Amino acid sequence: MEDILDRNLRGMTEAVRRNEITSVDLVQGFLDRIEKVNSSLNAVVSINTEIALKLAAKADSDLKEGIVHGPLHGIPMTIKDSLDTKDMVTTWGTKGRETFRPGRDATSVARLRDAGAILLGKTNTPEFTLSFQTDNLVYGRTNNPYNLEMTPGGSSGGAAALIAANAIPFD
């Protein structure tokens, strides 16, 4: 399975469609990778394990029935914490939004879900995405996987760190 987790996005989508790997295994593989690296990176600020695994099981079941939900069918992803997600808190890295749960997905999130992607969690961002480094009062600083004394930058620092650590295919 490790070689499939190391493939590019196209390779992963082809592996799922050819039944070389299930969406459940792919999602669990990336959840395991996130768990392994996130304590040192602080890249993922919230995780959606139970829902992600249920959606992956549904993607696998649908694929067996010949139903494909789009080009990203069953592929795990994360999303920046500045994008609204109906099933997860969206803080924008600011204290005033620590418990804010939007009523709907941002358009980009909805389109990714419609394309079949499975949202695993949210990645860290500077407050209001307005800094050259990813640090905020809600979740703290994100570290660069190649040098933990440095930041991966901003405003998508959580996403950048996670992708650089090969812990998610895209964000």
Describe these PLM feature segments.
Residues R104-D171:
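Short glycine/serine-rich loop segments
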Residues M1-K54:
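An N-terminal boundary/leader segment
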Residues M12-V16, A59, A159:
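Generic hydrophobic alpha-helical segments
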